[in-house]
Amino acid sequence: LKLVTGINFRHTDGWRNTDMQWDQNQLKPGSTMLTVNRSSNYTLSENLEWQVNRKLNLTAEGTYYERWVMRTHGPWKYLPNDFYYRNYTFAAGSRYKLNRRNYLTADLSYGRYGYFYDYKLKDITDYFKDGDRITYYPGQRIKQSIQQQVLAQVKGIFYFGDRHILNTGIEYQYNRLESPHHIAGDIASVYTLAAYAQEEWTATSNLILTAGVRGTQHKETGLNLSPKVSALYKAGNFNLRASYAMGFKAPTIKELYYEHTGSIGGSSLTAYHGNTDLKAQTSQYTSISVEYAGSKFQASLTGYANFIRNMIELVEIKVTPEEKLLEIEKSKKYTNLTKARIYGMDFTFNYRPTKYIMLGGGYSY
């Protein structure tokens, strides 16, 4: 039995680069806003590991986190609130050895992430309840969002002789977001269910082939299949690799449903809009690489191409008359772009001329 307790605390008084601030399409002097706000946070953690017997190993962990962000009030912005964050997570896992090298794992985790406003000044909002405008007062802590996530995984690794390794598993992920005034109906949720299988075949002492497929069912985007194949050929000190994979990225719960307004670093006040019509982002990725591993010198050269469809990006849209009344200067919405192509090359090397000296470098294009 092994227990590990962790305590971490951080604090900054904040700092700023300039007293200039962008406000109402003008750069104005005399601002009291900081580039980095004054803040404090701490994390408590507990980890448990129990080797029940030769076959079964159990783990558990939990964390608790709080953070306070203090904002300065003054020209040119009325900042009635500070920020407060409170998170906690729990996780449990197990690993069970079957015969020989085969084993099963099962993991379950839960996380809750809270974001609040701590009011220090009176704030007459643009929200209404029962026909009355909502007003907040100093000392109130008002929930902005509570995000909860559940992740469950079961995986099995199976060896068939000395040449075949089968990796299979299923995953379930559930996300729930509660955010008054920022989501229609105040609450939204999505789920993802996935299953996968991958076979690694050592065809010869020099050649290893891998093939797999992953199927994903998402609440909003439906079913998607993502195959993958790769090959590794060993020739003396050289390794030659080639791979092809189809990728899948479902839109996040905030990209789908969340609506909010904010300003980053004194920039323009911007409205951000989720989009329930988003499609899943898909990609086709291929790469070829050559590696050399000598006693003193190692190097790797990789070329790759990635063809992306329905890429999810924030796109600027026209500011509505209602947003202009709220002094919003920009408006952006999560949108699927038609296509994107990415080509690149990576080169890295390491050289050890003596026992005590090692040189290394790299270049990416």
Give, region by region, the residue ranges found by the protein language model.
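Extracellular loop and loop/strand-boundary signature of outer-membrane beta-barrel proteins
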Residues: P29-L34, H73-N81, T89, G93, ...
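Hydrophobic, lipid-facing positions within transmembrane beta-strands of outer-membrane proteins
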Residues: L1, Y42-E46, R86-A92, L108, ...
